[in-house]
UniProtKB/Swiss-Prot annotation:
The gene is pyrC. It is an enzyme of class 3 (hydrolase). GO terms for biological process: 'de novo' pyrimidine nucleobase biosynthetic process; 'de novo' UMP biosynthetic process. It comes from Buchnera aphidicola subsp. Schizaphis graminum (strain Sg). Substrate binds at residues 19-21, 45, 140, 224, 256, 268. Keywords: Hydrolase, Metal-binding, Pyrimidine biosynthesis, Zinc. SUPFAM superfamilies: Metallo-dependent hydrolases (SSF51556). Gene3D superfamilies: Metal-dependent hydrolases (3.20.20.140). Transmembrane segments: none annotated. This is Dihydroorotase. Coiled coil: none annotated. Zn(2+) 1 binds at residues 17, 19, 103, 252. GO terms for cellular component: cytosol. NCBIfam families: pyrC_dimer. Belongs to the metallo-dependent hydrolases superfamily. DHOase family. Class II DHOase subfamily.
């Protein structure tokens, strides 16, 4: 497909990794995801995490109520795994289609992960059930150990946790989310398995860790996993350009109020929902790989999750689009990814 293309029409994509938060933030940010994406995997790490069916049903209702009328958006709900998760609740939630998967957060590895797993061996009985019922496991793949350099935590997690896990449960469907390193890419490619995939964010494709320190510290580029060396950014860009079916779109859009991003203990997360699809198409164009854009955005994810591919389409046009400087929510603001900057692509109205 020509890199000089002025318009591209694709099957409407899904976002396989979204943080919508709750309350006033939810009411504002859900519109962006609901506009660009047909379905989205909703992360369960609220302050009161989505650990059971009741909370999931209630949260899903709040999401749908936050949408503008006639928005044909489908939130896909995930169970937050703890060491107290009930096997019966997990299985019932999956069979009743309340949950489409379960999320493993290593303890205190990211936002609202204090209820996460301290010892993965303590939930092997849950993985045994999930493997049998074909319930996907979504993983924040970082080893949370102060003795491990924070830039090495993904690679160490793969070596110390993921490899033994997959050896024990070879037919457990696993999504290694928001991958950031050559090591993650190599492992997924070497396995080349229908039971293992990775999602990739727009910010890890567009930026590397140098960008966090240009003209001073850039708190709005602080995310977990962190931006990595340029060689890892290049590896991510190369793998999506290869057309590999083992990787798909997961924006990890993660809103926080501006005041919580710039304070002494700033929150990790990049709110990219207003621009994520435009960022992805820009990278595919730069890599002269637009022929693989639809597969990455709209086909690889549903195929991995054994879900139907969407019937609707969306059209992107080569027309400059300026990202909002800020988004007002009551007396607070959220600063989106690439705030105030122009992208070469827009969504056709």
């Amino acid at each position: 497909m020509s890199k000089f293309l002025k318009k591209i029409k694709i099957i409407k994509p899904d976002d396989w990794h979204v943080h919508l938060r709750d309350n006033e933030i939810l009411k504002k940010v859900s519109q962006y995801t609901g506009t660009f994406y047909k379905r989205a995997i909703i992360m369960p790490n609220l302050e009161e995490p989505i650990t059971n069916c009741f909370r999931s049903i209630s949260y899903r209702r709040r999401i749908l109520n936050s949408m503008t009328p006639n928005t044909a958006f489908q939130p896909l709900m995930i169970c937050y795994l703890t060491e107290k998760t009930s096997p019966e609740e997990l299985q019932q939630g999956f069979f009743k289609k309340i949950f489409v998967g379960a999320k493993l957060y290593p303890h205190c590895s990211t936002t609202n992960s204090k209820y996460g797993i301290k010892n993965i061996n303590n939930i092997y009985h849950l993985f045994n059930i999930m493997e049998k019922i074909k319930m996907p496991l979504l993983i924040h793949g970082e080893e949370n150990n102060l003795n491990i350099d924070i830039y090495d935590r993904e690679a160490k997690f793969i070596e110390n946790t993921l490899k033994p896990l997959r050896k024990k449960f070879p037919e457990l469907k696993i999504i290694l989310e928001h991958i950031t390193t050559e090591e993650a890419i190599s492992y997924i490619e070497e396995c080349n398995s229908s039971y293992l995939a990775g999602t990739i964010t727009p910010h890890h494709l567009m930026l590397n860790r140098n960008n966090m320190f240009i003209d001073g510290i850039q708190p709005h580029l602080y995310c977990l996993p962190l931006l990595k060396r340029k060689k890892h950014q290049i590896a991510l860009r190369n793998v999506i350009s290869s057309g590999s079916k083992n990787f798909f779109l997961g924006s990890d859009t993660a809103p926080h109020f501006h005041k919580n991003k710039i304070n002494t203990f700033g929150c990790a997360g990049i709110f990219n929902a207003p621009s994520s699809l435009l960022c992805y198409v820009s990278v595919f164009e730069e890599m002269n790989a637009l022929q693989h854009f639809q597969s990455f955005c709209s086909e690889n994810g549903p195929n991995f999750y054994n879900m139907p591919i969407n019937k609707e389409t969306i059209t992107l046009v080569k027309k400059p689009h300026k990202i909002l400087e800020k988004i007002n929510i009551g007396k607070n603001i959220i600063v989106p990814f690439l705030a105030g900057k122009r992208l070469d692509w827009s969504i056709e109205k």
